[in-house]
């Protein structure tokens, strides 16, 4: 337990420090994109092809894997798999933290998105940090640890790790292809997502060690309802009521 806590606490601290440094650089002149932002933006504009071709529709699907709906769906799946145990509780806390951080930071920095004429999709909120990148960093890091801490077969875990590794890179990249974010928005979002995932994993480790929410809440609720129903069917002396 101690080793894991040190590892993920370190990851959380490092991600915060790196974000603070990045945010300071971006905020130095929030109205002017950095050179790396314009260079990466122009690169993706050159390779993305035309709106309406295969790459466009493929990325429309891919980008939804980090939408708010995806965060909710993953949460529901985790609840179903765990029957609402400490893993599901940890995910919910991390997801709420992620949403709060992203909302507050966007409002603080108020960075405008890239040129509207070159965007492939409509986005109305601020640019820094990227919400989709934040969701990607959070979900795919959490899911990787969820697999690590599970009893699934090794081959399933390996496939899951590979998929998480691929998606955490390519899903945020769709935001560059659509022209709605700069690369620094993406990096900032990933750092925030990694921080939120680290907090979730730390909570999961602590909950598991001290047996907090150890018994799935849905199982406990079912047993309580069943027991209450059985007691309700008994008479005053503990005998079953006759129909």
Annotate each language-model stretch with its function.
Residues 6-11, 86-94, 156-163:
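Alpha-helical transmembrane segments of integral membrane proteins
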Residues 18, 22, 101, 105, ...:
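Alpha-helical membrane-inserting segments
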Residues 72-100:
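Interfacial segments of alpha-helical transmembrane regions
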Residues 1-68, 108-120:
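N-terminal transmembrane-helix/juxtamembrane module of multi-pass inner/ER membrane proteins
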Residues 119-243:
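Membrane-embedded catalytic cores of phosphoryl/pyrophosphoryl-handling enzymes
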